[in-house]
Structures are given as structure tokens and as C-alpha cells.
Regions:
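Short, conserved active-site loop motifs that form the nucleotide-linked donor/cofactor pocket
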Residues: 102
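Non-catalytic beta-sheet/beta-sandwich ligand-binding modules that flank or precede catalytic cores
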Residues: 99
Length: 110
């Protein structure tokens, strides 16, 4: 909204979607399986322009276990990504089963 107020057309800006997950089962096996499921979207979800999955190495009290970063063409692509059949049926289903909690941010890349 602020960008559109100052004259930047947000519909033309790329979007970065970042989600951090705390998992119920923090075993290396579960974290690796979850990373594989997230990365399996590459090539299957057409809106994705870039994807990264990272595993936490500090393991502090405030740490999340795994992070997902996705780059998309625009806000419409983000909406399409959120509703993509593979994302909904495979990824969301797995993540809802294994996550304890999650936080997300979506922002424009200028």
C-alpha cells in the first residue's frame, strides 16, 4: 500500500515469500524429509521463480527449525502459488502434519 501511495506500481514488482517452521519432531530425519517435501515444489509449481530451504544450526530457544524462501513474479503469482494443487495437496498437507508453529512474511522486491 505504501509503495502504491508513493507511485510505485506494486503489480509489476516481484514478491518474496518467507516461512519459518518449528517442527513437532526435531529429528534430523524429519527435518531432512520436510526439506525434501518443500524443495519438491521446484518444477512442479509453475509460479516459483526461485526456491531455497534452510535448516537452523543454532538450535536456540527462539530458533525455528526450517526456513522456506520463494521468489515469485508478482502478487498474483503469490495467490496462484498459494492455491496451486501440488502446493495444497502435497506440501501444505505435510506441513500441517509436522509443524508445531510457523510465521510468514511476504514482501515486494524492488
Amino acid at each position: 500500500i505504501i509503495l502504491s501511495i508513493i507511485g510505485i506500481k506494486t503489480e509489476a514488482l516481484m514478491v518474496r515469500h518467507i516461512v519459518l517452521f518449528k517442527l513437532k519432531d526435531k529429528s534430523e530425519e524429519n527435518i531432512n524429509k520436510t526439506a525434501e517435501v518443500l524443495l519438491s515444489m521446484k518444477g512442479k509449481v509453475p509460479q516459483i521463480r526461485g526456491i531455497e530451504v534452510g535448516r537452523d544450526f543454532l538450535h536456540s530457544e527462539r530458533s525455528y527449525d526450517i526456513g522456506l524462501t520463494v521468489t515469485l513474479d508478482d502478487a498474483k503469482a503469490l495467490d496462484d502459488y498459494q492455491n496451486d494443487p501440488y502446493h495444497c495437496e502435497v506440501v501444505k498437507k505435510h506441513m500441517h502434519a509436522v509443524r508445531e508453529s510457523s510465521v510468514a512474511i511476504d514482501y515486494y522486491i524492488d
